[in-house]
Amino acid sequence: DITAIEQLKKLDGPIIILSHQGLAEQWSIDNAKEIQEILKSHQDKIIMTLNGHNHIDHIIKIGSIINFHINSASYKWVGGDHRHKSYSDTIHSKFPYIEYTCPYKDPLYTTVTINPSSKNIEIKGIMSEWVGKSPAQIGQEIHPGLSDGKEVCPHIRTRRVKRS
């Protein structure tokens, strides 16, 4: 979007970019490399990007920009090839799309704190567990570079991320 690029040029910072789909690495937008080149030229004022489309707990740094893939509040989508039952037949008949997910027992959420002077980031974690089987247990392949139980998991890890 040309307007967003123009805004990047005008703003002094600090900037946090929120998007539904990721701007870096696993399952990112189609033109992620092009977007990363634009963002890299403004990395002195961009603290982080934050997205949740992938339902993973993952951080990747590109230059000094922290790209945080935040986990979903309630489940990991596994799709039609991995349909299964995590709850009773009554629940599944009332909510038919739940069979396409690996749900979490408890909702996930986090607090992200940014130090205004250092621009370092602190992420407060929260743990849950799978209701039924995990994506790995039902045979869903994990994207290269991600680990079952680490990035593909029912939690958000506590982290302190230093901006370089």
Residue ranges with predicted function:
Residues D1-N67, H155:
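His/acidic metal-ligating clusters that form di-metal
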Residues H58-S164:
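Binuclear metal-dependent phosphoesterase catalytic core
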